[in-house]
Amino acid sequence: MHRRPSKQQVEREILSEKIKAVFHEHKGRYGAVRITKVLHNTGIMTNTKRVGKLMHLMGLYAKGSRYKYKHYNRKGASLSRPNLINQIFKATAPNKVWLGDMTYIPTKEGTLYLAVNIDVFSRKIVGWSMSSRMQDKLVRDCFLQACGKEHPQPGLIVHTDQGSQYTSSRYQSTLRQVGAQSSMSRKGNPYDNAMMESFYKTLKRELINDAHFETRAEATQEIFKYIETYYNTKRMHSGLDYKSPKDFEKYNS
């Protein structure tokens, strides 16, 4: 004769299934803290310690960095601008301060370069562009895409490093045409653009490191999906009180 499972066992099994569902919905990108927040948002009251223990028992582990991902070597900077934000990554409203940076994505077909602009207010990716060539057109296309979507007012601060793409006369002219101010990090100081660096670290941990893209087109498609259908709209950010950029803007703009 089999003993009927206790109430605690039933509750644990139900909670385990809920945890597993959230874990797989976010493709292994959420750890115990964020999964607990998701459960709270759906009315399930539990705590991070219990969620973490159940995840361990089920063999569920959030994606983590396995190796240090190198940026490309930035050369040829010929112009510097003042640092207008001084590591203060705060804004009072959308489209007051944007950050910009580039990185590279390996594929079996060859390297794909990615440029991104982030709005400091909500951490939303307002613009992004990809190319097989690391030229100033890449960062100009990214910035113009962001302007086309967000329509920033004159006075917008755009903070980047001193890479040659950002110091180029064509990029700087593009900023001036929309009334934007150029701000730049000190040479060799990644902390001056820490929020931007944090995004790339997240992108690589949650998508790139496990991807092994065959072609640039495949990488472009997956990065598009990650940014537009996940990062901006669903992914919780601890710095936004565990809201997505979309929800943070909705409740704070």
Curated annotation (Swiss-Prot):
Protein's UniProt keywords contain DNA-binding: yes
UniProt entry tagged with the keyword DNA-binding: yes
Keyword terms of this UniProt record: DNA recombination, DNA-binding, Transposable element, Transposition
Source species of the chain: Lactococcus lactis subsp. lactis (strain IL1403)
Gene: nisX1
Protein task: Involved in the transposition of the insertion sequence.
SUPFAM superfamilies according to UniProt: Ribonuclease H-like
BP terms from Gene Ontology: DNA integration; DNA recombination; transposition
Protein name: Transposase for insertion sequence element IS904
GO molecular function list: DNA binding
PANTHER family for the chain: TRANSPOSASE FOR INSERTION SEQUENCE ELEMENT IS904, TRANSPOSASE INSF FOR INSERTION SEQUENCE IS3B-RELATED
